[in-house]
Amino acid sequence: MSLSILIAGASFIGLLTYYIWIWSFWIRKGVKGPRGFPFFGVIHEFQDYENPGLLKLGEWTKEYGPIYGITEGVEKTLIVSNPEFVHEVFVKQFDNFYGRKTNPIQGDPNKNKRAHLVSAQGHRWKRLRTLSSPTFSNKNLRKIMSTVEETVVELMRHLDDASAKGKAVDLLDYYQEFTLDIIGRIAMGQTESLMFRNPMLPKVKGIFKDGRKLPFLVSGIFPIAGTMFREFFMRFPSIQPAFDIMSTVEKALNKRLEQRAADEKAGIEPSGEPQDFIDLFLDARANVDFFEEESALGFAKTEIAKVDKQLTFDEIIGQLFVFLLAGYDTTALSLSYSSYLLARHPEIQKKLQEEVDRECPNPEVTFDQISKLKYMECVVKEALRMYPLASIVHNRKCMKETNVLGVQIEKGTNVQVDTWTLHYDPKVWGEDANEFRPERWESGDELFYAKGGYLPFGMGPRICIGMRLAMMEKKMLLTHILKKYTFETSTQTEIPLKLVGSATTAPRSVMLKLTPRHSN
């Protein structure tokens, strides 16, 4: 027998042993859970667009309880729906759980030059968070209010045309056009509305529909393949939607830099006011005091540090990329679910319309007016409770071995929240947890966050940085629609909604009628 055959045989046995060792991790720990298959674990369960894996978690929770273990290729993941456990991981022990689960195709969060707020961790995440936070301040949100208003007016024109036909329309399609148009104008240098003629829309939709299949599956099982996929897609971005979008972002950034250089050469002074997120990031300076983490002290231990470094070119691309995707999909889905629930509950919709009529009596809607729409905020929060659309990112990676409520968690283990189960837990929400009741939020949401029971935008220090922008967009659009129309179900409305998705959980369609309010 030749030496090469012996080496090949030994390598195969070693590889097989390694994967069986990972696959049997939770068995050896005595932790219950679905086992799946060696090499795969249950990673394939999260690749079926028609049957979202995030909903599968709820089925497993019923079978195995609020804490159980799965393997996803080479990743070991603890699934939890115990609110106290969630609060412990996301808030109290953040210094032990500051990382997030990633796929190798996304790049090493410590080395990837284009790491963004969702993927970055440790010192780099804190720095990016510090530099990006001013972008979503009330001051800057007020600056982009006119852009949001213009985009709302443009969408209303399309909705008016659709409503005039007297037929139900798929509002999900309209909301996706709306959110991509807004994010294109405030984050991509887009100077005019491209609604219903945006060449980027099919690419963005592709990321959420097909972008997580084979490459992510293979990379999750064989991490080295993820590096190879990434290098290939970086070289040929048009092949894969996410890399194609990132290439588009890079072109937009280069165009703005060229414009700035040309203006400077021509002696044109800057206006002093940033046009959009690109300008805000290009001008970003972190010459401010912030709490820098020292690993020797623990991530949450704090020391004042000075940071005087500008965002790099690649970091700006990363931030714009993730803001584009998050700003497009989650806001469109939230609007869709809110509209559907209002159509199903006419009495709640009427109460909301009364608030809109009272607080926003004029055709033009202002920032201060939408800030007073408290019941609308309750409606949106309740819709996000019943349809936690982005729960795939509700996870943390253990960065230092620790014990959480009696469960020993090794470094490198992921903790994924079964958000759908958590958001319907009667111990948190009461016996009416299955009911759409916005009034539960009228006393504030601090109680539900403190219980660890509500995380549509995440929880703790890594909570979604753009949630105020998202709420502003939703309030603005719903205000304009509800001033003029009433949402109604039709024979084409799927009841209950058929849910699909992989990266997010989306309705297949939201077919509703827009009935004019004749009393106006």
Curated annotation (Swiss-Prot):
EC number, as in UniProt: 1.14.-.-
Pfam family, one: p450
Record CDD domains: CYP3A-like
Keywords from the named record: Heme, Iron, Metal-binding, Monooxygenase, Oxidoreductase
Domain of life: Eukaryota
Family of the protein in this entry: Belongs to the cytochrome P450 family.
Entry protein name: Putative cytochrome P450 CYP13A5
Gene that encodes the chain: cyp-13A5
